[in-house]
UniProtKB/Swiss-Prot annotation:
It comes from Mus musculus (Mouse). Keywords: Mitochondrion, Phosphoprotein, Ribonucleoprotein, Ribosomal protein, Transit peptide. Coiled coil: none annotated. GO terms for molecular function: structural constituent of ribosome. One of its GO terms (cellular component) is mitochondrial ribosome. Residues 41-60 are annotated as: Disordered. This is Large ribosomal subunit protein bL19m. GO terms for biological process: mitochondrial translation.
Length: 292
C-alpha cells in the first residue's frame, strides 16, 4: 500500500515538472503564431517613403460614354446649305465666302428654333445708340446672306415679334440665353397659344451649358386659345407635335382634320433632300477659312 502511494506521488511530481518546463515554449509558440497571422505591419503606420507600406488605391476615373465628343457634334448653320434646285452654284459660293468673313467679325452662336436669344442692334434713335430684344426663336428661314430668324416675346400683355437678318451689319451681338430645341421646327403657332408660353423676363440670365453636352429637347406642349386660329394647325400637313389638341378640339373636329392626311408623302423618296455630300464640302470650306 505504501509502495503504491509513493509511486503515484512520484508520477505527479514528474508531470508537474514537465508542465512547468513546457510553459515558456508554449508562450513563445503562441506569440510567433500571432505574429504570423497578423503580420508585423498590420497596425503600424508607415510613411509614404517606407518601402512595403500601405498605399491606398487610386481614385476611379468615371468616363461618361454617353457624351458626344465636340469634334463629332459639329453644328452647320442651315443657311449654308443651298436650296434644292439651285441654278447658279457660283453665286452661293461667293455668298458663303462673304458669310464666313462676316462671322470672323461677329461670332454667330449655335441656336435652334425654341432657343431663347438676346440680340443687341445699333439704333441711332435710342439713348445709348443700341437696343436689345429678348425672345424665343419661333422661325428660321432663308439661305445665304438672306437668312433670317424671328424672336417673339410678350411685353405688357402684347405679343411682339421681330424678324432679324442674321448677317445684318447693324447686329452687334447675338447671345444665347438658353439653348434648347422644341418638338417642332416651326413655332408660329405660339401666336395662337396662351401668352404664358411666349412670356420671358427681359433680364433673364444665361443658362450655362457644357460645350460637349447634347442640346436638350423641351417636350412642352402648349395650350391654345379658343378658335379661330391663324392657321388650321390640327391638319396633318403641318405635322405639329407641341399642341394639346385634346383640350382645344372635339373628336369630330379631329376626325375632320384627318381627312386631309396624305400618308404616302413620307414614303416619297423624291421629296428627300440628301445634303450629306454638300455638308462635307461645306466643312472643307469652313476649315480652310479658319486657317486663312
Amino acid at each position: 500500500m505504501a509502495a503504491s502511494m509513493a509511486e503515484s506521488c512520484r508520477a505527479s511530481l514528474y508531470l508537474a515538472r514537465s508542465v512547468r518546463m513546457a510553459r515558456p515554449r508554449l508562450a513563445a509558440f503562441a506569440s510567433d503564431a500571432c505574429r504570423v497571422c497578423t503580420g508585423p505591419s498590420r497596425f503600424q503606420s508607415t510613411g509614404p517613403s517606407e518601402p512595403g507600406g500601405f498605399k491606398p488605391p487610386p481614385k476611379p476615373v468615371i468616363v461618361d460614354r454617353r457624351r458626344v465628343p465636340e469634334d463629332e457634334r459639329r453644328f452647320l448653320s442651315p443657311e449654308f446649305i443651298p436650296p434644292r434646285g439651285r441654278t447658279n452654284p457660283l453665286k452661293f459660293k461667293i455668298e458663303r465666302k462673304d458669310m464666313l468673313d462676316r462671322r470672323k467679325v461677329l461670332p454667330i452662336p449655335e441656336f435652334y428654333v425654341g432657343s431663347i436669344l438676346r440680340v443687341t442692334t445699333a439704333d441711332p434713335y435710342a439713348s445709348g445708340k443700341t437696343s436689345q430684344f429678348l425672345g424665343i426663336c419661333i422661325k428660321r428661314s432663308g439661305n445665304g446672306l438672306g437668312a433670317t430668324f424671328t424672336l417673339r416675346n410678350t411685353i405688357e400683355g402684347q405679343g411682339v415679334e421681330i424678324c432679324f437678318e442674321l448677317y445684318n451689319p447693324r447686329i452687334q451681338e447675338i447671345q444665347v440665353v438658353k439653348l434648347e430645341k422644341r418638338l417642332d421646327d416651326n413655332l408660329l403657332y405660339l401666336r395662337d397659344a396662351l401668352p404664358e408660353y411666349s412670356t420671358f423676363d427681359v433680364n433673364m440670365k444665361p443658362v450655362p451649358q457644357e460645350a460637349c453636352q447634347e442640346v436638350p429637347v423641351n417636350k412642352l406642349k402648349v395650350k391654345m386659345k379658343p378658335k379661330p386660329w391663324s392657321k388650321r394647325w390640327e391638319r396633318p400637313n403641318f405635322n405639329i407635335k407641341g399642341i394639346r389638341f385634346d383640350l382645344a378640339l372635339t373628336e369630330e373636329q379631329m376626325k375632320e382634320a384627318q381627312k386631309w392626311n396624305k400618308p404616302w408623302i413620307e414614303f416619297d423618296m423624291m421629296r428627300e433632300y440628301d445634303t450629306s455630300k454638300i455638308e462635307a464640302a461645306l466643312w472643307e470650306e469652313i476649315e480652310a477659312s479658319k486657317k486663312s
